[in-house]
């Protein structure tokens, strides 16, 4: 008998569907009804889990941050050297190139939208870039580039976003 993966809780399913919808359509353009329909629940059930759109946004940001940290941790285990770990970063960009070309960077588009809206959660969303920045800087430190590790990390982040459009 095959064991099935555990079904996510309704709350977790809401967060995952909202994450995808926010990426595909934007935070402002995604309604409660859109998310409830994607999850397949009534609006009443939806409101049981989340009272406001900002409540969902906070959970989506936390979800993205956790996914990012999980990815960075996996790269740390996969790559024995900083070069191998940096290649994991590059491979992620290659693997996601079509979505990024079509929809933009998941973190960058959310940060840009929240900045335009002057939303109070824009700083929290920006912290995901900080996760990448610190991780990349650490790889450069391990390569012996201690003095300019952060500058190199920022440069690589900026270049990675611009290279996606080539």
Predicted regions span which residues?
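Hydrophobic alpha-helical connector segments
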Residues: 59, 73-103, 153-156
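Hydrophobic/aromatic residues within well-ordered alpha-helical segments
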Residues: 53, 60, 64-68, 82, ...
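Hydrophobic alpha-helical bundle segments that form small-molecule/ligand-binding pockets
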Residues: 117-119, 129-153
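Basic, helix-initiating cap at the start of DNA-binding domains
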Residues: 1-25, 29-41, 54-55
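Conserved small/polar residues in nucleotide/adenosyl-binding loops
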Residues: 164-166
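Amphipathic alpha-helical segments used for helix-helix packing
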Residues: 84-85, 99-120
């Amino acid at each position: 008998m095959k064991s099935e993966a555990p079904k996510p809780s309704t709350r977790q399913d809401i967060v995952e569907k909202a994450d995808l919808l926010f990426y595909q359509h934007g935070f402002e353009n995604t309604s409660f009804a859109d998310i409830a329909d994607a999850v397949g629940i009534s609006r009443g059930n939806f409101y049981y889990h989340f009272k406001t759109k900002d409540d969902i946004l906070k959970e989506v940001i936390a979800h993205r941050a956790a996914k990012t940290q999980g990815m960075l941790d996996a790269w740390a285990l996969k790559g024995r050297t900083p070069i191998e770990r940096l290649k994991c970063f590059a491979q992620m960009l290659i693997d996601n190139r079509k979505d990024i070309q079509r929809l933009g960077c998941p973190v960058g588009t959310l940060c840009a939208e929240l900045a335009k809206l002057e939303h109070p959660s824009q700083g929290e969303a920006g912290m995901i870039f900080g996760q990448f920045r610190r991780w990349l800087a650490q790889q450069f430190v391990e390569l012996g580039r201690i003095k300019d590790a952060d500058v190199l990390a920022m440069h690589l982040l900026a270049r990675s976003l611009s290279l996606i459009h080539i």
